Structure formats: structure tokens, C-alpha cells
Design a protein with these regions (language model features):
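Short, glycine/acidic-enriched loop or turn micro-motifs at the edges of active sites
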Residues: 44-46, 68
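Conserved catalytic cores of phosphodiester-cleaving nucleases, focusing on short active-site segments
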Residues: 32, 51-74, 81, 89
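Residues at secondary-structure transition points
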Residues: 19, 23, 48, 72, ...
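Acidic-basic catalytic patches of nuclease active cores, encompassing PD-(D/E)XK
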Residues: 1-42
Length: 137
């Protein structure tokens, strides 16, 4: 298999949305674990709303939205979290907080996972996104 064929097979495997998103979420979860966090939930749902990851970093509850892109279909994953998505994340986080009885310290992170043409992966973490207004950590 030459390099072009290899890239095409990799692109096809990674470009299926369910595969691409799930792999990105697993990579993001692994990064949080390596940093000492505990993953409390993956793909947690409240009605139609979903939080990709819920993690605990020390005493801080972290709600994580993961955006995974391939190099050829790039674009900033962070920019894909538009107002509609932010509203859904707020609703889901409020549902989680209600379910557990609240948390004194929490934050939102957005993690971008970029699968490069050479097969390598770059992960960029945006910590403390102010989806509720002022940060609470």
C-alpha cells in the first residue's frame, strides 16, 4: 500500500462522524485522566441535550464539549460551539447539577481534536469557557 492509499483508508475510517467523534472523545478523556482527573460520565444525556465528558479535577467539576476534525475538513472546533450548542450545554449541565444536588466549583472546557494528514493527532484544550456568564472556579 502506497502513502496515498494509506491516507485514503485512514481518511475513510476517521471521516465517519460516529467514528471520528467517538475517537476524539476517547482521546480527550485519556488526556484528562493523564492529568489526574476522574471521568464521571461520557455522552451523558438530559433529554435531547448531551455533555461529551463530565470529569472531576480535584474539587472542580468539569463539563467538556469535544470537537473532532480531520485536517482536510478542518475549521476551528471551538468556533463550532455556537449559541445553540452553548444553550444545549447549559441545559445539560444544569440538569447534571440538579441531579447531584449542585457543586460549589465547576467549569466548561472545549477540547479540539485535530487528526492530521500524517495520522498524528493534535489536542487543544480551552479551559473555563464562560457559558453561564462569570466563571465559577
Amino acid at each position: 500500500m502506497d502513502l496515498r492509499q494509506w491516507w485514503e483508508s485512514l481518511r475513510k475510517r476517521w471521516s465517519r462522524p460516529e467514528t471520528l467523534g467517538a475517537r476524539g472523545e476517547r482521546l480527550a478523556a485519556a488526556r484528562y485522566r493523564r492529568a489526574g482527573a476522574t471521568i464521571l460520565a461520557m455522552n451523558w444525556r438530559a433529554g435531547q441535550d448531551e455533555i461529551d465528558l463530565v470529569a472531576l479535577e480535584g474539587r472542580v467539576l468539569v463539563f467538556v464539549e469535544v470537537k473532532t476534525r480531520t485536517a482536510e475538513h478542518g475549521g476551528a472546533g471551538h468556533a463550532a460551539v455556537d449559541e445553540r450548542k452553548r444553550t444545549a450545554l447549559r441545559r445539560a449541565a444544569k440538569a447534571w447539577l440538579r441531579e447531584i444536588g449542585g457543586a460549589p466549583h465547576w467549569r466548561f472546557d472545549i477540547v479540539e481534536v485535530l487528526v492530521c494528514i500524517d495520522g498524528s493527532v493534535r489536542i487543544l484544550q480551552h479551559r473555563g469557557e464562560p457559558l453561564f456568564g462569570p466563571r465559577r472556579f
